[in-house]
């Protein structure tokens, strides 16, 4: 099976999107939804339907999204990372219709148009889509940081790990890091006879 090459944001590109000052309130909301998706792996349809009831707090005070994928009905769970938690806290008291978390307007096409403005202000050389946030989660936020593919697959709500392999790219930097760690481990295991 041949996999399509998927795009994702690098860590520095994601940071530029997080940091950028935006002139428009709604563009800011759309940027925040994009960043939230990049840090949780949610798709547009999942973030659009996300309610406060989908956010659960465990015994240690950690907040988790526990829900079912809109597309497949597969359950997923993902912990809110600190920036995602800050974004959630920004909108939790808005009292939106249906107890929704984000005040998103329009379709994914409308959101993608807004993300073009975000990209321009953030200095990106391409126009990201909301779906690119999911690929960024799989690649930059999780796999590159050492999260196992099986765990990423469960957090994305994939039924088959082969689907996750399409989303996730192992970067050359990650290969270098892993090989350096392996070399260090093996140096104490194997010795060349003199």
Regions found by a protein language model. Give the residues of each.
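Extended hydrophobic-aromatic, low-complexity segments
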Residues: 26-27, 45-48, 57-60, 75-78, ...
